[in-house]
Amino acid sequence: MPVASPPAPSAAERIRSVCVSATGAMLAVDGHTAVDTPVHHLLDDGAFAVTAAADGDMTAAAGNATGVEAVLELTDHAPLALRSPVRSLVWIRGRLRRVPAPLVPALLDVIATDDPNPSLLQVNSVPCNDTQLSLLWLQTESAVIADATGAESVELRDLLAARPDPFCVLESSWLQHIDADHREVVDLLAARLPVSLRRGRIRPLGLDRYGLRLRVERADGEHDVRLPFAAPVNDVTGLGRAIRVLMGCPFLNGLRARRG
């Protein structure tokens, strides 16, 4: 009888989280060198608003009447310095077009409301001698996420229905803090690993509402293990309680020590 996998975010949820927290994004068009895109924002209709140098090849190609086929690659890096730092990659394929000039100001406002990215100031202007950027639309045709376990495609309707993980923004700082200042927490969590995986360098790898992931770095390679919470959590209070349960701290689970 197959062993059930522990609860985990869906592929659509993972893509939505990477869209928010990705530490690298590249825009590629056949026949041109891929370029960094400092803005990559998923809009309500499923298109991505992206930016590229106003005088660059991407903007020129997107200026054609029919646009051009393009791929947006988002990289999800682990927040710690690991031997294999890339946790997942997301590829968004679609048709790239320039945003008509009259629509740019309103679209910038929409993006800035959710993500006040300083690079938005470079669209149609050049503050502090930075590169002038153009705002482009990538009309999504397909979305794929890949990690060490394989690749999975996601329908656009499922992508729009999903939401980013509630902890994707604080995940990096939280894991860095635990790894640097609270190794005792990591040691307690590591005690829940299979005995065969307890030898090696154990580091926090990921955090989401379903649980924690640990990376075990050994001479024979890396092993990732999910430690699921008893139930999904949606706020910091619930997160703290769930982690204490994983650590095996009885009094912090809601019990109280006897007095007297």
Which residues does each predicted region cover?
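Short, surface-exposed beta-edge/turn micro-motifs
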Residues: 22-25, 45-47, 67-69, 132-135, ...
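A structural signal for short, well-ordered beta-strand segments and their strand-loop junctions
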Residues: 26-28, 73, 135-139
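Catalytic micro-motifs at enzyme active sites that drive phosphoryl/nucleotidyl and oxygen chemistry
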Residues: 14, 36-39, 58-59, 77-83, ...
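A general structural signal for short secondary-structure junctions and capping/turn motifs
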Residues: 16-19, 62-64, 82-83, 88, ...
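General beta-strand recognition
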Residues: 48-51, 71, 137, 213
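An N-terminal domain-cap segment
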Residues: 1-63
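C-terminal edge-of-domain segments
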Residues: 107-260
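Short, structured beta-strand-loop surface elements
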Residues: 55-118, 133, 142, 222-224
